[in-house]
């Protein structure tokens, strides 16, 4: 029983430490930004749809979300300031 408790404690500690490590942030601008985003989206298997494809579904509630992330763009988030891969993936 003590060994199971020790293993559980060790696993929970390892999991906690791995979640506490900060994700690397970099500045991406110009071609580097475009290539990195294209590579990440391709690896993630994201098939970005155009606004016309959303309109073909005819769902009025989808239209406000087809504009993307609003006023802040990828350049604001990843070129003017460093950003993580998670932020880049959110633009796929």
Swiss-Prot record:
Residues 1-19 form the signal peptide. The modification Pyrrolidone carboxylic acid is found at residue 20. Residues 50-70 form a propeptide. SUPFAM superfamilies: Insulin-like (SSF56994). GO terms for cellular component: extracellular space. Pfam families: Insulin. Disulfide bonds join 29-79, 41-92, 78-83. Transmembrane segments: none annotated. It is found in: Secreted. GO terms for molecular function: growth factor activity; hormone activity. Keywords: Cleavage on pair of basic residues, Disulfide bond, Hormone, Pyrrolidone carboxylic acid, Secreted, Signal. Silk worm has two kinds of PTTH: 4K-PTTH and 22K-PTTH; there are many forms of 4K-PTTH. Belongs to the insulin family. Heterodimer of a B chain and an A chain linked by two disulfide bonds. Brain peptide responsible for activation of prothoracic glands to produce ecdysone in insects. This is Bombyxin A-6. The gene is BBXA6.
């Amino acid at each position: 029983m003590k060994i199971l408790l020790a293993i559980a404690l060790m696993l929970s500690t390892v999991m906690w430490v791995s979640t506490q490590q900060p994700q690397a942030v970099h500045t991406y601008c110009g071609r580097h930004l475009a290539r990195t985003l294209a590579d990440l989206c391709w690896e993630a298997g994201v098939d970005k749809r155009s606004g016309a494809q959303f309109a073909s579904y005819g769902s009025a509630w989808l239209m406000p979300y087809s504009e993307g992330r609003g006023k802040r763009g990828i350049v604001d988030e990843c070129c003017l300031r460093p950003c993580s891969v998670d932020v880049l993936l959110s633009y796929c």
